[in-house]
């Protein structure tokens, strides 16, 4: 214990820090600090060729670094706050930087700013609607947060309606706040979802899988029946087909496809297409 007490804090911090490029697509744990390679200075605290990730003006020439879910800025480093796999997406310009986030598996949804979610209106308090989004507390939604809404022209929102919107405020110290308009004031598909259709819940991992650009599941589902579908990052899916039977079939397929292989999905889709 005496030897451990004599170790400088800087040495302990250096032991915790790891190079982000060496742990991409690997499991990271809460409390770990991430470093990125710095070509300008090879003698950093992370070892040869590594130094702390700079998030100030000095790093702008190397590209902007965006801190996604599961990561938090801690001085000039990134601190891991969730257990999961570290992911990275290169910027379109190819100038370095990009988006870093932790792909984690969790049951309860934690609101994230910019996420599009499906909520259920549970109450109306003055000019504010309370919306259940599956988090630890309901989100607030102003009646002015709809396209074309004014004090005289109020949106027709009732308790029990389904709302598709996005978060503009989402952090641990404030109540989540939703809007149904984009930065240009347009609805862009957001607002009250139709009365018909079926709402069901899936895992957060399946939602991310279905929303991936190279997802083949949606392409195969779209060939079966004409449908309307809305995905919420909070694990909720709303789907509507021509008949109730088709709607139930689509919901069952989407729920079951998470644990299916590609061959199993092809067999099911071929059988449904024949019938």
From Swiss-Prot:
Subcellular location(s) of the protein: Cytoplasm; Nucleus, Nucleolus; Nucleus
Pfam families: KH_6, RRP40_N_mamm, RRP40_S1
Alphabetical list of InterPro entries matching this protein: Exosome_RNA_bind1/RRP40/RRP4, KH_dom_type_1, KH_dom_type_1_sf, NA-bd_OB-fold, RRP40_KH-I, RRP40_N, Rrp40_S1
Sites of N-acetylalanine modification: 2
Cross-linked residues, Glycyl lysine isopeptide (Lys-Gly) (interchain with G-Cter in SUMO2): 151
Swiss-Prot/TrEMBL keywords: Acetylation, Cytoplasm, Exosome, Isopeptide bond, Nucleus, RNA-binding, rRNA processing, Ubl conjugation
Main location per the UniProt record: cytoplasm
Keyword Cell membrane: no
GO biological process, one term: nuclear polyadenylation-dependent rRNA catabolic process
Stretches assigned to coiled coil: none
Molecular functions (GO terms): RNA binding
Cellular component annotations (GO), alphabetically ordered: cytoplasmic exosome (RNase complex); cytosol; euchromatin; exosome (RNase complex); nuclear exosome (RNase complex); nucleolus; nucleoplasm
Function, in words: Non-catalytic component of the RNA exosome complex which has 3'->5' exoribonuclease activity and participates in a multitude of cellular RNA processing and degradation events. In the nucleus, the RNA exosome complex is involved in proper maturation of stable RNA species such as rRNA, snRNA and snoRNA, in the elimination of RNA processing by-products and non-coding 'pervasive' transcripts, such as antisense RNA species and promoter-upstream transcripts (PROMPTs), and of mRNAs with processing defects, thereby limiting or excluding their export to the cytoplasm.
Similarity comment: family membership: Belongs to the RRP40 family.
Subunit structure of this chain's protein: Component of the RNA exosome core complex (Exo-9), composed of EXOSC1, EXOSC2, EXOSC3, EXOSC4, EXOSC5, EXOSC6, EXOSC7, EXOSC8 and EXOSC9; within the complex interacts with EXOSC5 and EXOSC9. The catalytically inactive RNA exosome core complex (Exo-9) associates with the catalytic subunit EXOSC10/RRP6. Exo-9 may associate with DIS3 to form the nucleolar exosome complex, or DIS3L to form the cytoplasmic exosome complex. Exo-9 is formed by a hexameric base ring consisting of the heterodimers EXOSC4-EXOSC9, EXOSC5-EXOSC8 and EXOSC6-EXOSC7, and a cap ring consisting of EXOSC1, EXOSC2 and EXOSC3.
The protein's name in its UniProt record: Exosome complex component RRP40
Native organism: Bos taurus (Bovine)
């Amino acid at each position: 214990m005496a030897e451990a007490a004599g170790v400088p804090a800087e040495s302990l911090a250096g032991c915790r820090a790891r190079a982000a490029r060496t742990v991409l697509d690997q499991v990271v744990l809460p409390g770990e600090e991430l470093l990125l390679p710095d070509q300008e200075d090879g003698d950093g605290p992370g070892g040869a060729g590594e130094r702390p990730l700079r998030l100030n003006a000095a790093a702008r020439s190397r590209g902007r670094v965006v801190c996604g879910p599961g990561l938090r800025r801690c001085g000039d480093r990134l601190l891991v706050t969730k257990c999961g796999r570290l992911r990275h997406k290169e910027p379109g310009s190819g100038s370095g930087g990009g988006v870093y986030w932790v792909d984690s598996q969790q049951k309860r949804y934690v609101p994230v700013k910019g996420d599009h979610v499906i909520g259920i209106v549970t109450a109306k308090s003055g000019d504010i609607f309370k919306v259940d989004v599956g988090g630890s507390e309901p989100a607030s939604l102003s009646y002015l947060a709809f396209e074309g809404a004014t004090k005289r022209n109020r949106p027709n929102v009732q308790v029990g309606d389904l709302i598709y919107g996005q978060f503009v405020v989402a952090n641990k110290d404030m109540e989540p706040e939703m809007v149904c308009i984009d930065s240009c004031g347009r609805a862009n598909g957001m607002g009250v979802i139709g009365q018909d259709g079926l709402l069901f819940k899936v895992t957060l991992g399946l939602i991310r899988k279905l929303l991936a650009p190279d997802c083949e599941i949606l392409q195969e589902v779209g060939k079966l029946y004409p449908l309307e579908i809305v995905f919420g990052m909070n694990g909720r899916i709303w789907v509507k087909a021509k008949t109730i039977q088709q709607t139930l079939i689509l919901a069952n397929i989407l729920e079951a496809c998470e644990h299916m292989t590609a061959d199993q999905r092809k067999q099911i889709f071929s059988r449904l297409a024949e019938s």
